[in-house]
């Protein structure tokens, strides 16, 4: 009974961490939308990741001391973050540039399927009809909350690249937890954020060398500084930390269910700034919530059931 209560408490805490993570993450969308009016996409992502990394390193130094930073597995964390979060985020951007926002959003909405497939293949997770029904509701709810018009969907190489992006992000989240079991969530987040920052810096300098668009850096205004801190510290640093904590508690499959609810969170944030309420997104969020609960619920066992083993 005690173990059951501990499991339920861990699941509740994990789901709460995922919700907080997605809430913080969603603040990045309106901030980025405003910054991209003057900033180049490559320069903005590179600076955002650098500021987020410095924030996490500072937080680590404050919590455990500067000396402990030398003991972290920086090289291993770099490569997990480089491939999982760095390449994954860039591939999603490439997918949108090759198709449209609808197709990229559909590819991102498949992340729960990719995440569950990883758990089945690598962790031996057993699927039940109840869990699969929950996954179906989560995907349906996310598509509804996103307001996607399927008539705009384009199947092709761009969509397949988007699927790869979702798979890499799911793999990176799982690898951050499973590959660094000896570390606390904050340390896991910090070492892998280094890899994500390194990849985006590599892309930025490559774009500079080849004189590609998206590298312009304007003279920052006071408003830019505020938005950059929101985008880097809140939508990346705190969000990624809470996200890794949640993944460690409920697994990447269930955690990914929360991530695709971001459009609903963004709507709530924009509502504060005077934008309208969308019942379609609200209904989608409700469907998604039912799916999350269903996927984690366990059927009641018959307490009077007897063992089938021979005496």
Report each predicted region and the residues it spans:
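Glycine-/small-residue-enriched transmembrane alpha-helix faces in small-molecule transporters
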Residues: 1-45, 151-178, 202, 268, ...
